[in-house]
């Protein structure tokens, strides 16, 4: 049976609108009807078989059970598309400036320990074999005025490319902190050098990427939420210069303005200044926040009680 779009839309309406007997969430109904119509049209256009359809549903079930749907959304470019869409909305509204946004990814956890000005992020478990890293910078508005008491939430992977909470071998909130900027708008984080990571090689995301002929690797990076009263919350990250996947990020997160250089510091006075006892890496990364707008996208949160 071949259907045209008018017939498809009529069928979807019959099955999912006309059958309603209870209170309807009109927005959910609108989205479901549109997505089903588009899916039915794709089935017609591509002559998808029932086997292919059920295989797809089985895949989504497996991805959900593996907690990889968020990873899949990043890997297929959905998150990056939303960023581009938000950029276009800003441009149309005449909103300019500010640190570029980029994807959140699926590995944020709310509730990290808070401090003012400075925080040590790592638990010391990798100190003997991984370079220490100092990340510091300032938070200002687009005119360069400092923003004290801005909340800088930071999280990144360890030297194996794993994140605490998702990697049960790490201590709680390892490499996760919330730092409120000091009176000069500054934050300083002492941590360890992260590395990039790949999708689980036997996981559902990599399985689909294999069928598309794509790799599933990310460059070394550090995630941020930056927020302050009166300003739009910024979701972003920087990728570290020199990584082979810097401009070949499977999640499409690398953007101009979001590339950081990790400098080697061997000067003894500098080492002492940061209360360290050996050479370390140093990254300077500043943020500019845009004044608040009427609508700010909500963030997904994993809340740990």
Curated annotation (Swiss-Prot):
Record text on subunit structure and interactions: Homodimer.
Induction profile: By phenol and benzoate.
CDD domains: 1_2-CTD
InterPro entries assigned to the protein according to its UniProt record, in alphabetical order: Catechol_dOase_N, Cchol_dOase_prob, Intradiol_dOase_C, Intradiol_dOase_core, Intradiol_RC_Dioxygenase
Provenance organism: Acinetobacter guillouiae
Family: Belongs to the intradiol ring-cleavage dioxygenase family.
Annotated catalysed reactions: catechol + O2 = cis,cis-muconate + 2 H(+)
Protein name as annotated: Catechol 1,2-dioxygenase
Example GO BP: catechol-containing compound catabolic process
Positions with a binding annotation for Fe cation: 163, 197, 221, 223
Reported cofactor(s): Fe(3+)
Single GO MF descriptor: catechol 1,2-dioxygenase activity
Record's keyword terms, sorted: Aromatic hydrocarbons catabolism, Dioxygenase, Iron, Metal-binding, Oxidoreductase
Top-level EC class: oxidoreductase
EC number: 1.13.11.1
SUPFAM superfamilies: Aromatic compound dioxygenase (SSF49482)
Cofactor comment text: Binds 1 Fe(3+) ion per subunit.
Pathway(s) of this molecule: Aromatic compound metabolism; beta-ketoadipate pathway; 5-oxo-4,5-dihydro-2-furylacetate from catechol: step 1/3
Pfam families registered for this protein in UniProt: Dioxygenase_C, Dioxygenase_N
């Amino acid at each position: 049976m071949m259907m045209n779009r008018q017939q498809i839309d009529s069928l979807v309406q019959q099955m999912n609108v006309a059958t309603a007997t209870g209170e309807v969430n009109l927005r959910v109904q609108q989205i479901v009807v549109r997505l089903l119509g588009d899916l039915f049209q794709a089935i017609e256009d591509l002559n998808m078989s029932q086997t292919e359809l059920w295989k797809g549903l089985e895949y989504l079930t497996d991805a959900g059970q593996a907690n990889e749907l968020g990873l899949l959304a990043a890997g297929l470019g959905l998150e990056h598309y939303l960023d581009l869409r938000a950029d276009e909305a800003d441009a149309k509204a005449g909103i300019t400036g500010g640190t570029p946004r980029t994807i959140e990814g699926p590995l944020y956890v709310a509730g990290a320990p808070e401090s003012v000005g400075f925080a040590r992020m790592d638990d010391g478990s990798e100190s003997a074999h991984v370079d220490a890293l100092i990340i510091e910078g300032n938070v200002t508005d687009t005119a360069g005025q400092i923003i004290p008491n801005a909340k800088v939430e930071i999280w990144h992977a360890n030297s194996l490319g794993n994140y605490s909470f998702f990697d049960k071998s790490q201590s709680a909130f390892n490499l996760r902190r919330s730092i409120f900027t000091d009176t000069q708008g500054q934050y300083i984080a002492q941590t360890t050098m992260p590395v990039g990571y790949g999708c689980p090689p036997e996981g559902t995301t990599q399985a689909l990427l294999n069928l598309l002929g794509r790799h599933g690797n990310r460059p070394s990076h550090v995630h941020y939420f930056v927020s302050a009263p009166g300003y739009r919350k910024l979701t972003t990250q920087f990728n570290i210069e020199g990584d082979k996947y810097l401009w070949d990020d499977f999640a499409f997160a690398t953007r101009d303005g979001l590339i950081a250089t990790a400098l080697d510091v061997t000067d003894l006075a500098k080492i002492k200044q940061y209360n360290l006892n050996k050479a370390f890496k140093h990254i300077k990364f500043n943020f500019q926040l845009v004044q608040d707008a009427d609508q700010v996208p909500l963030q997904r949160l994993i809340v740990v009680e």
